[in-house]
Amino acid sequence: MWNKHRLAFILVGLLFHLFYLRSIFDIYFVSPLVHGMRQFKSNEEPPAKRLFLIVGDGLRADTSFDKVKHPVTGKTEFLAPYLRSLVEHNATYGISHTRMPTESRPGHVAMIAGFYEDVSAVTKGWKENPVDFDSVFNQSTHTYSFGSPDILPMFKSGASDPTKVDAWMYGHEFEDFTQSSIELDAYVFRHMDALFRNATVDSKLRHEMMQDGNVFFLHLLGCDTAGHSYRPYSAEYYDNVKYIDSQLERLVPKVREFFGDDDTAFVFTADHGMSAFGSHGDGHPNNTRTPLVAWGAGLNRPVLNDVPVYDNYTENWDLAHVRRNDVNQADIASLMSYLIGLNYPTNSVGELPLAYVNGTERTKLNALYKNALSILEQYLVKETEMIQSQLVYKEYPKFAQKSHSSYIQEIEHLIDRIANGEEDLEPEAIALSEELMKTALEGLQYLTTYNWRFIRSIVTLGFIGWITYSFTIFLRLFILEKQYAMKTSPQNLASFGALTAALNYVLYYQRSPFNYYMYLLFPLFFWSQILTNSTILHDGIREMFKGVSMLQRIGICALIVSIYEGIVYGYFDRWIFTIIFNLLALYPFFCGIKDAKTNMFWGANSMALSIFTLFDAVKIESLTQINVSGLLLVASGLYALWRVSKKINSHTKIVILLQILLLAMMLAVTNKSVTSLQQRAGLPTDAKIAGWVILTLSLSLMPLLHYLKPSNDYQVRVLVIYLTFAPTFLILTISFESFFYLLFTNYLMLWIEIESKIKAQNIAKNSQNWLQLLRISIIGFFLLQFAFFGTGNVASISSFSLDSVYRLMPVFDPFPMGALLILKIMIPYILLSTALGIMNLKLNIKDYTVSSLILSTSDVLSLNFFYLLRTEGSWLDIGVTISNYCLAILSSLFMIVLELFSHFLLKNVRDNGMDIAASKQQKRH
């Protein structure tokens, strides 16, 4: 029953969790991006007139230079002989080290804008989403870009003058994972050739193309597409690399012929690599190491090593005699700016890689100094903003010891002395410029985190206040019988009023955003209410733990905290869930269940489920596992139908048989799709259509047919729900997930029966045991986490395999593909929702008791993850901590959603002749 107290409680909880969900992005992940900086030109006498940037999307560094055995021809060869010849004779080469996430948008932003998008960019997509900061394209005279519609628009739309960036893009339908990826790259080279041809008959176009400072950007998506579809060790991936190399060999002389000079600079690199599983996104070296080969005007020729340099990673490259010059990905933007004399992008944090520059030491020094001034300017603008918004400002300690003006004076003094002939001072000036850049970047981070301590303290008090306040409300609504009329004392009002005014003034002076005021409002409200309702808290705890000694209370609390902390660690190491499951295998015995058969089945199921969190979260497609699990799903459906056949009418029996038939048909369709895709024959049209038809029928028509003549038995309803989602789960299975689906459903049914037996024992003893409610809530919350982590983790989603998705959607489209992934993730939650609803029915638990108790305790997880958030390290690690926090803070709210959804799923369901409506009348009010 909903009353005003419950509604107020839910509303406050909803607002609190939504605002505090946002808090991490306002605290930890505020963008260091600043605007209004002066611009610094990299080079007054640029060595190149134009620049070609060629990006092999998804190209690994080792594949570019390794001698590999072709899986089809059996021939051992270098895949890119032309690039190798450049490395050995004409170019400077190295590895470009990317940051995480190793995705297309952040990779291109880093190399073209010189800026690593802050972690708040994880909330952004990449399609049609313009970059909101300066870039090499923005500074260029004109940019001609060719390639993917996922990359080109964000730089064209984000340019200060979109007309200066031209884009030739293929349609999204070209990105078909089952077709030849070479066609994507062929489109780029064809249109580059067409541009040259058109310029021979269009004088205006030719004039524009002949201008100094132009950039030609060739985005080659083929390797990424082939890697996703067939893995980076496939013939398709290797052939795509060979195709790119052959086209580069044709392109370079065409460029020389068209422009009639050798004043073109070429930069070849990649945005990210590719894992052995055909995915990217995380911090694995195969994803973060990309090739960088730069040749042409203004660029050094190769430097030979006096002594060959060998290491395990490059031993098959046969390039030990050539010096390798590694860079950070953002450094490429500074290099490109220097080559054609552009202003450094105003938000760039890249450092000019001097090893690539062919110029005098004085030229290099001046360019590097301007690079340092460009980065320092970002710090100075940010510092000015900070000084104007702080009651007391403390300067960055390193600049307090040695001011930025002192750095500038020293460097300029050294430059003057070098100009007067003291060239031996050049290394010192370069080192000082690099030190200034490093200190300015550290100072920028210091300013970004300046107010952390204050606002984190507020959020911490908010979480602790919510846990205490919500538990008090739970006790009042569900445990205590009598009504309390509590009023806030004048002293309470006065003290909290004064504190509110003082803290809000601090926020106002700091020009804090609106959200900060809300972060402050919640702890002030919670702690005021806690002091007012302290009597309820005291009486409620005494009632809930009636008959339980103080030592036992401490033990129960310690156990609950241990389980929650175990769940926290399980977010990072899934094997913790294995331990918890094996401990849960013993709980029926300790709760007094003497039935050996029940204990044996429960223990066996617990241990079987515990194995899943030991499997690798990143799965490899296995048709054998899909077939075995699919047959078990069909067999389990037939067995369950036999068990309930005496309870159901002929209509229900026919519909269930149809559901089982659809499941068997989906298994056949999945087999055909997987086999065809593995044989590189594409996705058969009939299999694609059949997959969508079966999925639609199982999720829509079958439930409607049941609704015409519904069975109200809870076991039948569970079977119907189980078979409704089984075909969808099966076609989206990569390997072992359908085993999980079967065992998880069985586990939930066993849990219901065990708790029903424990309830019967309590009734026989004529005792009201609130500890059963506490136990159900804790186990239910654990299963809520396991429903997600049983088949994967956050990292496996961030770089999820497309194997299952392109059985239904062979053409790349991230949003529908993401929707299918979310549907697969949600299905175990629907099963859990059903189980909790039946538990409420069988145990006569008042509606929303379980979810309210979880809501009041589960933010122990949220508080943990708030302090476990990372802002440094790999983007995978950072992204995982963000996702963990979001999962934790939303999971308690999700329990309410599950309980609400269970009312819909279990409408009119009966247990032993008693329907929900009748059951509710017997519940305590």
Curated annotation (Swiss-Prot):
EC class (word): transferase
Keywords from the named record: Cell wall biogenesis/degradation, Endoplasmic reticulum, Glycoprotein, GPI-anchor biosynthesis, Membrane, Transferase, Transmembrane, Transmembrane helix
Source species taxonomy: Eukaryota, Fungi, Dikarya, Ascomycota, Saccharomycotina
Name used for this protein in its record: GPI ethanolamine phosphate transferase 1
UniProt record, GO biological process: ATP transport; cell wall organization; GPI anchor biosynthetic process
Family as reported in the entry's similarity comment: Belongs to the PIGG/PIGN/PIGO family. PIGN subfamily.
One Pfam family matching this protein: PigN
GO molecular function per UniProt: mannose-ethanolamine phosphotransferase activity
Topology class, membrane: Multi-pass membrane protein
